[in-house]
Swiss-Prot record:
Species this protein is from: Pseudomonas putida (strain GB-1)
A Pfam family recorded for this sequence: Asp_Glu_race
Lineage of origin: Bacteria, Pseudomonadati, Pseudomonadota, Gammaproteobacteria, Pseudomonadales
Name the record gives this protein: Glutamate racemase
Function: Provides the (R)-glutamate required for cell wall biosynthesis.
EC number(s) stated in the UniProt entry for this protein: 5.1.1.3
Transport is among the record's keywords: no
């Protein structure tokens, strides 16, 4: 039985999961968080499911060695490829994954047209198709794969003209099709909200699932009597790329500095 004071492992293909990490820390400030950014293998969205499962198994094993009491797959593509596999490997481990916010978007739309920005891997998955079948029968869903977007966000420069131009190229067709609700189907994309605010009308809802994932983690930890009790927890970081790169990006995306260690390939 894990201790309440044990850490929670959070992983992503890169820095996108920091958007989820922030929501977890906001809701559960007493938790100690371990974050692995698999930047040496980013992006996951264009890689095979088998490759992604291998990476997720490797990282889950690391969290297990660190004594983590729960794990969050803060990556839509990793969830699609690996969550079932990891639940089979670790059946007693509280495990939270991501999925595009199809249900709340379908409820929120007024025009009946919902746009989805996501990676190719997420959009082509059976899990995403099942979400549409379950929650989006009464709305039109227009999907937009966004190759290249994750790589630009990984640089930490969220105001570059190249990023702005690429994002507009993906968003403009959705707006032209009448979308009044946009789903951010990748954990990297919430960092683009300031850019999106200048591109989409004020009455277009932009939805992601970071806060919902934090609430689900809270429910699972509570159900297993694993919620940490003061003092405030901290966050520690690992990366499969150059640690110095993540150290420079953390103040931009995490709004704090952090200790970053190398994660063995």
């Amino acid at each position: 039985m894990a201790e309440r004071s044990a850490p929670v492992g959070v992983m992503d293909s890169g820095v996108g999961g920091l958007s989820v990490l922030a929501e977890i820390q906001r809701l559960l400030p007493n938790e100690t968080l371990l974050y692995v950014a698999d930047c040496g293998h980013v992006p996951y969205g264009e890689k095979s499911p088998d490759y992604i499962r291998q990476r997720c198994r490797h990282i889950a094993g690391f969290f297990h060695e660190q004594g983590a009491k729960a794990m969050v797959l803060a990556c839509n593509t990793a969830t699609v490829a690996a969550v079932a596999d990891l639940r089979e490997l670790y059946p007693t481990w509280p495990l939270v994954g991501m999925e595009p916010a199809v249900k709340p978007a379908a409820a929120a739309t007024r025009s009946g047209v919902v746009g989805v920005l996501a990676t190719t891997g997420t959009l082509q998955s059976a899990k995403f198709a099942a979400l549409l079948d379950r929650f989006a029968n009464d709305v039109q869903v227009i999907t937009q794969p966004c190759p290249g977007l994750v790589e630009l966000i990984e640089t930490g420069d969220l105001t570059s003209p190249v990023l702005r131009q690429m994002l507009w190229g993906y968003v403009q067709p959705l707006l032209a099709a009448g979308c009044d609700t946009l789903i951010l189907g990748c954990t990297h994309y919430p960092f683009l909200r300031p850019l999106l605010a200048g591109m989409v009308p004020a009455d277009v809802a932009v939805i992601d699932t970071g806060a919902a994932v934090a609430r689900q983690l809270q429910r699972l930890l509570g159900a297993n009597d694993l919620l940490a009790e003061g003092p405030a927890g901290d966050a520690r970081f690992w990366t499969s790329a150059d640690p110095e790169i993540l150290r420079k990006i953390l103040p931009v995306l995490w709004h704090k500095c952090g200790d970053v260690q190398s994660f063995a390939l």
